[in-house]
Amino acid sequence: MAPAKNQENINQKLALVIKSGKYTLGYKSTIKSLRQGKAKLIIIAANTPVLRKSELEYYAMLSKTKVYYFQGGNNELGTAVGKLFRVGVVTVLDAGDSDILTTLA
């Protein structure tokens, strides 16, 4: 029961970031924001391909950005951010009113 409750909590925090903060969706924009040093946190879906995931981890390590591995796949991550399409990676640029940066990392 605890993992489901934790997942709901993360989804709520993510929804608050979408509402009040700044974020980007997708691989290309994530790499761009990591290279510019603007990213605070990246959230990677569970079914992201291994090569793409390792490249994101590498850029996150270079820019000293926190990485969170979302428990669900890209369909669930897309639903969590309120989109009707699949999302493999979400980059949090500014958390807004959410405390996602302190709780996830």
From Swiss-Prot:
Keyword Amino-acid biosynthesis: no
Family the UniProt entry places it in: Belongs to the eukaryotic ribosomal protein eL30 family.
GO cellular component: cytosolic large ribosomal subunit
Coiled-coil blocks: none
GO biological process: negative regulation of mRNA splicing, via spliceosome; rRNA processing
One Gene Ontology term of the molecular function aspect: structural constituent of ribosome
Record organism: Eremothecium gossypii (strain ATCC 10895 / CBS 109.51 / FGSC 9923 / NRRL Y-1056)
Keyword field contains Magnesium: no
Protein name: Large ribosomal subunit protein eL30
Keywords: Ribonucleoprotein, Ribosomal protein
Entries under InterPro entries matching the protein: Ribosomal_eL30-like, Ribosomal_eL30-like_sf, Ribosomal_eL30_CS, Ribosomal_eL8/eL30/eS12/Gad45
